């Protein structure tokens, strides 16, 4: 499947559905309240994330694809906070704001990685007139390659049949993540993406693969779908279409930490790929890979183009390969939660030689994960002179990504990685050569966090300068 790509240059996706804001309060619980037999949580930090249809839009934006989001919110602080959060990710928000309803908000209180309580602030929109929302859809849909209707049963999709007909009239495929057991209301959609529980609640118990295929094809015929994608957790996913063989994909998940939002990821990647002109098979393959990535993260999460590209090309077995700083921080947080020891080193790695390979292998043996921070081309030029680097950053990163000792690669543009090391805070900082530990960039930050710093020896006679000199001598 290496010919598949996570670059969606032609895609534009429109999302309409139940938007909500997920709020998280994290704190310590060290005592019971004297007022009632409940724990007292001393809140230490909080976080806000887009939920529902807004998380679908976030998933699409993380793939560097233009996305517009339509939905209903209140005229309140929460609605403004949600809009601001989405706009920072370059999502075009066009909401109908209602003075009669609050923005749907879910507040979760957590301590020691356990959810203690969830507070829901909502009043469903089932009695709200959809005229303004339908007008917005009619004006916008013709400019997009796919429409996602994200149904969380909150009432935004009251007039879902009219929405489907508007999209069909514009010849835009409609993908729906369904809710409830009344699938008749989705008649005429291009594709539904129920999970196995939702599917069986509608068609009945499926004991065999044949049952899934037979009942799925009957459902397609009954409600006039073009296709049906049943997501089956650890059993992968199955695509069904009239007159064609079932297309089954085994799960891509290596480790499962949280399935929150996995369905949003599936439909987001699926719609993006179809909007980019990909086949159903390729779109399903890509969404399956993306789901395998996102369930390895905590909470409602998204998948980036880099993560998806790495996984497609088989680089996920050594971590997530090449990452940006934000992705690296998430990966490190998850690894530390699993009790893994993080080792970090850095360098230019202009011309990779046996000394580099041996050094990185030795560094990797000191922990469970190895991060390699690599100087950008401008950074190398400032340090080594105008004739360097010999190999540009993408080339250097690609070669390093091929080493089994390297888990994660990240670029930095400063002269030293001190800032980056101070933000990542590895358990062990490693540097090769004749440095004193206290002179290594980032050592003070690592020590202050309780980590350690170690100097490793390079192999004698192995250096990039020596390699360059030999090449020059041969040229002369």
From Swiss-Prot:
Region feature Cytidylyltransferase, mapped onto this chain: 344-476
EC number of the protein: 2.7.1.167, 2.7.7.70
Region (Ribokinase): 1-318
Family annotation (InterPro entries): Bifunc_HldE, Cyt_trans-like, PfkB_dom, RfaE_dom_I, RfaE_dom_II, Ribokinase-like, Rossmann-like_a/b/a_fold
Pfam family, one: PfkB
Any one GO molecular-function label of the UniProt entry: heptose-1-phosphate adenylyltransferase activity
Amino-acid positions noted as binding ATP in the UniProt annotation, renumbered to this chain: 195-198
Membrane-crossing segments per the record: none
Catalytic activity: D-glycero-beta-D-manno-heptose 7-phosphate + ATP = D-glycero-beta-D-manno-heptose 1,7-bisphosphate + ADP + H(+); D-glycero-beta-D-manno-heptose 1-phosphate + ATP + H(+) = ADP-D-glycero-beta-D-manno-heptose + diphosphate
Gene Ontology CC annotation, any one: cytosol
Tree of life domain: Bacteria
Residues of the active site: 264
Pathway: Nucleotide-sugar biosynthesis; ADP-L-glycero-beta-D-manno-heptose biosynthesis; ADP-L-glycero-beta-D-manno-heptose from D-glycero-beta-D-manno-heptose 7-phosphate: step 1/4; Nucleotide-sugar biosynthesis; ADP-L-glycero-beta-D-manno-heptose biosynthesis; ADP-L-glycero-beta-D-manno-heptose from D-glycero-beta-D-manno-heptose 7-phosphate: step 3/4
GO biological process, one term: ADP-L-glycero-beta-D-manno-heptose biosynthetic process
CDD domains (alphabetical): RfaE_like (cd01172)
Keywords for the protein's UniProt record, in alphabetical order: ATP-binding, Carbohydrate metabolism, Kinase, Multifunctional enzyme, Nucleotide-binding, Nucleotidyltransferase, Transferase
Function according to Swiss-Prot or TrEMBL: Catalyzes the ADP transfer from ATP to D-glycero-beta-D-manno-heptose 1-phosphate, yielding ADP-D-glycero-beta-D-manno-heptose.
Record text on subunit structure and interactions: Homodimer.
HAMAP family: HldE
Family: In the N-terminal section; belongs to the carbohydrate kinase PfkB family.
Protein name in the entry: Bifunctional protein HldE
Lineage: Bacteria, Pseudomonadati, Pseudomonadota, Gammaproteobacteria, Pasteurellales
